[in-house]
């Protein structure tokens, strides 16, 4: 198995915060794989450090490519390239790699699913002054589980429902200064339900 990161486990290791899934549980599962004979080489990116052709030359005969979730999606609004913005996957990965990170100021998380909630709760643990979640959906239709929502509120994180991002305003250094939201009356078209 070739893993481009320094530790195996993919999203289990780098995408799920340790307050939800302790890393020693993942490590134990990986040890079982090793005991079964799986040889794991970390820090090797297929297509960059090795190629399918070079692996064939080494004697590999079959390939299973499981690249997982490699990135996130920005909302396509003006200013989203401002310094200080991040997609969820990168934020959670960086938080796992560098646990000494301290967030200064306020953090806004856009989204209403469990991954957005993970980002908000992680930001709170990294000492953000204030964490606010903005979700298109109303509270009863948020994709996040009710338990996740309640735990988020218990941690003092504000959830604002029915808002979508319109624009990120940058300061003179290209950093996020503020984010402008628009009120969302309905997520789905009442006629087509799309």
Segments the model singles out, each with a brief description of its role:
Residues 24-73, 86-97, 103, 126-194:
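A Rossmann-like FAD-binding core segment of flavoenzymes
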Residues 9-16, 145-151:
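Active-site-proximal loop->helix
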Residues 1-13, 131-140:
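Glycine-rich FAD pyrophosphate-binding loop
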Residues 9-10, 72-74, 117, 141:
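Conserved protein kinase catalytic core
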Residues 75-79:
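Conserved catalytic-core motifs of eukaryotic protein kinase domains, centered on the activation segment
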Residues 100-129:
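Rossmann-like NAD(P)H-binding beta-loop-alpha module
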Residues 16-22:
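Catalytic nucleophile-loop/oxyanion-hole region of alpha/beta-hydrolase
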Residues 15, 42, 110:
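Thr-Gly-centered strand-to-loop micro-motif
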């Amino acid at each position: 198995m070739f893993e481009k990161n320094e530790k195996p486990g993919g999203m289990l290791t780098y995408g799920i915060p340790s307050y939800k899934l302790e890393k020693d549980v993942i490590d134990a599962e990986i040890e079982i794989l090793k005991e079964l004979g799986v040889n794991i080489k970390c820090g090797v990116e297929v297509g960059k450090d090795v190629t399918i052709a070079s692996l064939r030359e080494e004697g590999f005969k079959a390939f299973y490519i499981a690249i997982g979730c490699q990135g996130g999606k920005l909302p396509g609004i003006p200013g989203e390239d401002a310094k200080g913005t991040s997609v969820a996957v990168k934020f959670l990965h960086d938080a796992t790699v560098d646990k000494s990170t301290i967030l200064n100021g306020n953090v806004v998380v856009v989204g209403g699913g469990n991954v957005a909630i993970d980002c908000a709760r992680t930001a709170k643990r990294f000492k953000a002054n204030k964490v606010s979640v903005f979700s298109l959906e109303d509270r009863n239709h948020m994709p996040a589980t009710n338990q996740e929502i309640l735990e988020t509120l218990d941690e003092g994180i504000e959830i604002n429902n029915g808002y979508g991002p319109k624009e990120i305003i940058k300061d003179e250094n290209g950093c996020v200064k503020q984010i402008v939201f628009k009120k969302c009356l309905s997520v789905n078209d009442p006629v087509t339900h799309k």
